[in-house]
């Protein structure tokens, strides 16, 4: 099923009503002064529903509670109905900028303390902004709920006076770094921005990017930001959603205590949906630092939850949703294009129907040729019509996506919050399923004729620099010059915080209650006679089954000169079998709502299987067919190989890829470990179909395989379903590989050139420890935690929060059974490359010489040992836990052993590990950026600078 089905579940896109599928209790179940009961929905008489209770505070704050006692954790989401679409002309990027500022402290929460307190509590947190909303969310152990509510309330009601010019300037630089990393320094990064400028009329809320224009942010001042907060961040424009192991009465009392005194903000209406049309195709183009050209066609359609959204989604699936789609058949399978797809993303005010394709250089087809194939495919669709299987696949995907979306508390809370924000009805999930199930063939043809056939689009060509002649057609449209709007200055005396007195001391951090015990998943063991070891766990929260089959046949089993063989085999196993074509296999899986993905890691060929349990046996038959009966079709191999080569060439345009590639090569030198599992242009060119068949026959055998299962079925029923694998026999060749220490020169900078790069990619590190679960590797990872392993680590706080050089910086130990490494990394502003290296080196040296502080040790212990509540919640999390046990031959007791290590490790032990493993003179540095600018700066630091080519 195409990704949009998961997206619509994640954002709870819904329309037609089906009130028979819910039970609404009209009476108040809890009475607390200042809180008004709205409704309660239970899970009776409905196939898919998220039970909840809904309330409203006197100040307008909407509160939604969802109880789920299966794990001792809570997820808290506060969504403000403001995104970039609420911004004024000339003040783009404010919503996203403000998201950053909301982590900079408030009256009673010090700068950077929000991250510290949540991390210390064993939780995770983040925020996000899109065109229509901004949300902040935390998942924490259940005993930490009050602390999170205190934190969120403090930045809602007590933020303004804590904002300083210094914080403002640092976060402005951080946003610029984020734009550099995600937009300006990324291939095709400006595509969506340019298309939106051409598609929407000037002043339309979607005509500017969410991240904003830098000149708008440069013009902004502190008062502008404060005014934005006062306009949009009132409780009456917010939804607070809390889910997990909660007591509703106690939770509501806490909500009233912390949020009740906050004054309502200005009234907020639902945004208008401005209508617009384009009266002719608009051709636009740009040159970019890319290898492959790209064509992108965007048609305006409807808006979120419009009655035609669902049939348009079905249409997008038919035209470009995977191997059964028309674009795949006409462009990808024919090797005219490396990639081609269709999507129909929807937002609150508008949706777009988008086609894109990247021509394959070997086809010698122009973007104009590709555009014609797309238009011919539309004609083919009109002649073909809508088939019954098209609707069956969509409905199966909706059902499975909905059920899989209920596996985590965070997923359920996110759906409730989004549904409330955009429809004033948290219970939209059932209605969403209903409207997709109601789509008919006639609906799909109707929306095709209304929104696509003979309609006009923005047609964007992105071509490599110097190849402007390759665009699909000459530009015939120029967006109007951007207006800065009235840009009226906001007077400082026009902004005043409205603070009401509390009957408690808000400055005191709430203390946590007793940490609830976390049960390690109970598990069962088994094996098949063919040598596959099985480890399973029963999870009855959803009627689903997830499996991971690991066969010792990964990247390290390939020869160095043919690196990429294992990954190409994995791709071939996802193609045709002797019984079905690739399209028929994809069709069969989509009709079941199941997925089978195969990929090669370093040590294992991994087969991931997800299915509704009712379809498990049918899904396993297809998985078995993929593994045992690959067709190895020559044309499919050539297509996959050629596409992989083009991908390897295109990757060289990405600074992060170049840095990681150079770093890997330097740490491993003449060894298969020095080459990515996907191979490179040279090694991929060496691989033949015969090599793939040979690798398959020598290595893809069941002996020593590992199968991990998480299902609502018990051991007996699961074992019965797995019985078909008994007929698979054989032993693969043993891995014979060592990864010796390289003789790479250390203490120097290896410089990889990327002309005119807006950012530089930095990697600093060395070969280090092999992975172990409770030994020195684990203890070294603990040692690194306060240095570079958390958001509020020394490295990130320095380079991001204090200096504004980067969007994020980190350090970590990584390893497997053969080798390991220590790495510090970041993408930084090009003009701060040398200064960033100075700060990296200073932080690493200082930590190695002076060690950890008492406060950092306390933080480490609390953060690591309270994470257990979050470790085993979802089937995916359980799969990872069981896979770790099976691969390393552990018992569940290793969890307690790790906890004991965290609780008892001393400062002296940590400091000794830092001294041993963080000697900066034993490390090498890789810098990717504009060499002509960077070389003199780096040499001025006193390092030898060595040019390095990839």
Task: State the predicted function of each range.
Residues 17-63, 247-287, 329, 430-550, ...:
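Proteolytic maturation boundary segments
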């Amino acid at each position: 099923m195409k990704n949009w089905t998961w997206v619509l579940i994640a954002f709870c896109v819904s329309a037609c009503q089906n009130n028979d599928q819910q039970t609404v209790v009209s009476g108040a179940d809890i009475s607390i002064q200042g809180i008004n009961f709205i409704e309660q929905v239970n899970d009776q008489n409905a196939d898919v529903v998220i039970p909840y209770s809904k309330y409203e505070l006197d100040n307008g704050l909407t509160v939604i509670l969802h109880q789920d006692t299966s794990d001792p954790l809570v997820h808290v989401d506060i969504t403000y109905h403001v995104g970039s679409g609420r911004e004024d002309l000339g003040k783009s990027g404010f919503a996203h900028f403000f998201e950053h500022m909301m982590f900079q402290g408030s009256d009673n929460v010090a700068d950077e303390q929000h991250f510290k307190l949540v991390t210390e509590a064993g939780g995770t947190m983040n925020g996000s902004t899109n065109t229509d909303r901004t949300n902040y969310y935390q998942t924490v152990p259940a005993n930490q709920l009050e602390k999170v509510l205190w934190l969120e309330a403090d930045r809602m009601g007590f933020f303004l006076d804590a904002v300083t010019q210094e914080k403002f300037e640092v976060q402005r630089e951080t946003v610029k770094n984020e734009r550099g990393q995600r937009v300006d320094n990324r291939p095709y990064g400006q595509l969506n921005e340019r298309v939106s400028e051409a598609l929407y009329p000037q002043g339309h809320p979607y005509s500017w990017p969410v991240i904003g224009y830098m000149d708008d942010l440069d013009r902004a001042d502190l008062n502008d930001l404060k005014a934005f907060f006062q306009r949009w961040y009132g409780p009456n424009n917010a939804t607070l959603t809390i889910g997990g192991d909660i007591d509703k009465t106690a939770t509501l009392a806490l909500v009233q205590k912390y949020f009740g005194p906050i004054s309502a903000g200005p009234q907020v209406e639902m945004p208008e949906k401005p209508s617009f049309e384009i009266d002719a195709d608009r051709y636009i183009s740009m040159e970019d630092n890319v290898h492959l050209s790209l064509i992108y066609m965007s048609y305006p359609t409807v808006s979120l939850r419009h009655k035609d959204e669902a049939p348009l989604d079905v249409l997008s699936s038919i035209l470009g949703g995977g191997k059964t789609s028309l674009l795949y058949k006409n462009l990808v399978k024919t090797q005219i294009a490396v990639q081609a797809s269709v999507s129909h993303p929807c937002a609150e005010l508008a949706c777009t129907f988008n086609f894109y394709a990247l021509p394959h250089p070997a086809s010698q087809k122009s973007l104009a040729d590709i555009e014609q194939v797309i238009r011919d495919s539309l004609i083919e669709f009109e002649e073909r019509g809508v088939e019954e299987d098209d609707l069956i696949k969509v409905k199966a995907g909706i059902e499975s996506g909905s059920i899989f979306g209920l596996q985590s508390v965070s997923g359920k809370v996110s759906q409730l919050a989004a549904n409330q924000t955009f429809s004033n009805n948290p219970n939209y999930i059932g209605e969403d399923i209903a409207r997709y199930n109601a789509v008919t063939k006639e609906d799909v043809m109707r929306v095709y004729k209304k929104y696509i056939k003979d309609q006009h689009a923005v047609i964007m060509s992105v071509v490599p620099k110097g190849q402007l002649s390759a665009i699909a057609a000459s530009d015939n449209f120029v967006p109007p010059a951007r207006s800065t709007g009235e840009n009226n200055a906001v007077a400082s005396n026009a902004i005043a915080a409205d603070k009401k007195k509390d009957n408690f001391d808000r400055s005191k951090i709430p203390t946590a209650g007793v940490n609830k015990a976390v049960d390690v998943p109970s598990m069962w063991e088994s094996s098949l006679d063919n040598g596959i070891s099985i480890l399973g766990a029963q999870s009855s929260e959803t009627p689903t089954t997830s499996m991971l089959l690991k066969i010792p046949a990964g990247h390290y089993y390939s020869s160095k000169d043919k690196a990429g063989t294992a990954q190409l085999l994995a791709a071939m196993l996802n193609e045709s079998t002797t019984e079905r074509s690739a399209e028929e296999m994809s069709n069969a899986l989509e009709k079941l709502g199941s997925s089978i993905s195969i990929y090669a890691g370093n040590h294992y060929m991994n087969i991931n299987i997800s299915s509704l349990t009712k379809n498990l046996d049918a899904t396993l038959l297809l998985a078995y067919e993929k593994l045992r009966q690959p067709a190895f079709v020559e044309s499919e191999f050539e297509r996959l190989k050629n596409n992989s080569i083009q991908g390897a060439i295109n990757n060289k345009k990405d600074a992060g890829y170049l840095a990681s590639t150079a770093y890997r090569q330097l740490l491993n030198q003449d060894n298969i470990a020095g080459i990515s599992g996907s191979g490179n242009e040279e090694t991929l060119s060496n691989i033949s179909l015969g090599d793939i068949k040979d690798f398959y026959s020598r290595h893809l055998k069941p002996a020593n395989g590992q199968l991990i299962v998480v299902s609502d079925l018990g051991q007996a029923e699961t074992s019965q379903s797995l019985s078909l694998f008994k007929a698979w026999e054989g032993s693969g060749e043993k891995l014979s590989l060592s990864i010796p220490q390289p003789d790479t020169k250390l203490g120097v900078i290896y410089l990889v050139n990327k002309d005119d790069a807006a950012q530089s990619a930095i990697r600093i590190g060395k070969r280090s420890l092999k992975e172990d679960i409770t030994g020195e590797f684990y203890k070294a990872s603990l040692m690194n935690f306060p240095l570079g392993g958390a958001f509020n680590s020394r490295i990130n706080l320095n380079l991001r929060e204090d200096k504004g050089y980067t969007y994020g910086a980190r350090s970590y130990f990584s390893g497997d059974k053969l080798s390991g490494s220590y790495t510090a990394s970041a993408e930084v502003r090009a003009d701060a490359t040398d200064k960033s290296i100075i700060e990296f080196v200073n932080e690493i040296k200082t930590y190695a010489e002076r060690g950890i502080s008492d406060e950092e040790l306390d933080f480490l212990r609390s953060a690591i040992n309270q994470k257990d509540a979050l470790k085993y919640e979802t089937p995916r999390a359980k799969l990872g836990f069981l896979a770790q046990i099976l691969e390393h031959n552990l018992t569940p007791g290793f969890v307690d052993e790790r906890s004991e290590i965290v609780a008892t490790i001393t400062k002296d032990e940590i400091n000794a590990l830092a001294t041993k493993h963080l000697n900066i003179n034993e490390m090498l540095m890789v810098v990717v950026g504009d060499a002509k600018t960077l070389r003199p700066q780096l040499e001025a630091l006193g390092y030898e600078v060595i040019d390095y080519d990839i």
